[in-house]
Swiss-Prot record:
InterPro entries: Glyco_hydro/deAcase_b/a-brl, LamB/YcsF/PxpA-like
Protein name as it appears in the record: 5-oxoprolinase subunit A
Gene from which this protein is expressed: pxpA
Subunit-level organization: Forms a complex composed of PxpA, PxpB and PxpC.
Family: Belongs to the LamB/PxpA family.
Catalytically driven reaction(s): 5-oxo-L-proline + ATP + 2 H2O = L-glutamate + ADP + phosphate + H(+)
Tagged with keyword Lipoprotein: no
Top-level taxon of origin: Bacteria
Function: Catalyzes the cleavage of 5-oxoproline to form L-glutamate coupled to the hydrolysis of ATP to ADP and inorganic phosphate.
Keywords linked to the UniProt accession: ATP-binding, Hydrolase, Nucleotide-binding
EC number: 3.5.2.9
Pfam family, one: LamB_YcsF
Length: 255
């Protein structure tokens, strides 16, 4: 068995640092880089692209709502389909330009935060994101939360998909993520997270916060780079995967 490990990086902004990108990028096989709307800036994007290129990991765009103050974790109501398409295409294009200048290429797109959460439940938003990805480059892999409406939107657009599960987030019984506003939504114990992910991969099931097993396709596992002890969590998980005979590789290299 082989799995991809993806991490959201490039979330620093100006003089304000966020995360431990240099350490995390050594443990991931794919990275999702903030494109300036919810976090990041041109210089941070370039630094993160260079790091990713040095370590041979997949480079992905991580578009979100234009909400620096809220880190893209607050829904923005009233956007039209066209407005969503434009904000997604804008951010993908920005990272593509930076990557091209650095001699690398963008391989995938993963929606960030509230944009992703809304799209998981709202067909219009999901279709708009998928439409933007296809319009920019139909060869981009669309990284989507497993069992969400983004899966159907990506399939309808004819995009290659990577189904994602989360190492450090709890799930509701319907397969959606537990809101960050609720207790227990974000997991922090590295050993428990590692055991959980190994069990998920071996069983093909995620266990919800109430104990309900949910079947999910799993192509990539996300570890959030802004989680406290993210580096320790990632290292513990990598070791647990190795101990259980589970290899890691970029999803585009997994047969």
């Amino acid at each position: 068995m082989t799995i991809d490990l993806n991490c959201d990086l490039g979330e620093s902004f100006g003089v304000w640092p966020m995360g431990s990108d240099a350490a995390m990028i050594e443990l991931a096989t794919s990275v999702n880089i903030a494109c300036g709307f919810h976090a990041g800036d041109a210089d941070t994007m370039r630094k993160t692209v260079d790091l990713a290129g040095t370590h041979g990991v997949n480079i992905g765009a991580h578009p979100g709502y234009r909400d620096l103050h809220g880190f893209g974790r607050r829904p923005i109501a009233g956007l039209t389909s066209g407005e969503i398409e434009n904000l997604v295409a804008y951010q993908i294009g920005a990272l593509q330009a930076i990557a091209t200048m650095a001699g690398h290429r963008v391989t995938h797109v993963k929606a960030h935060g509230a944009l992703s959460n809304v799209a998981c439940e709202d067909d219009m938003t999901a279709r708009a994101i998928a439409s933007a990805v296809k319009a920019v480059d139909p060869g981009l892999v669309f990284v989507v939360p497993a069992n969400s409406r983004l899966v159907a939107a990506g399939e309808a657009a004819g995009l290659p998909l990577a189904h994602e599960v989360f190492a450090d987030r709890a799930y509701e019984d319907d397969g959606s993520l537990v809101s960050r506003r609720k207790p227990g939504a974000v997991l922090h114990n590295a050993d428990e997270i590692a055991r959980r992910v190994v069990t998920m991969l071996q069983s093909g099931e995620v266990v919800s916060i109430t104990g309900k097993p949910i079947r999910m396709r799993m192509d990539t596992v996300c570890i959030h780079g802004d989680t406290p002890d993210a580096v320790r969590i990632a290292r513990t998980l990598r070791q647990a995967l190795k101990d259980n005979g589970i290899a890691v590789a970029p999803f585009n290299l997994i047969k």
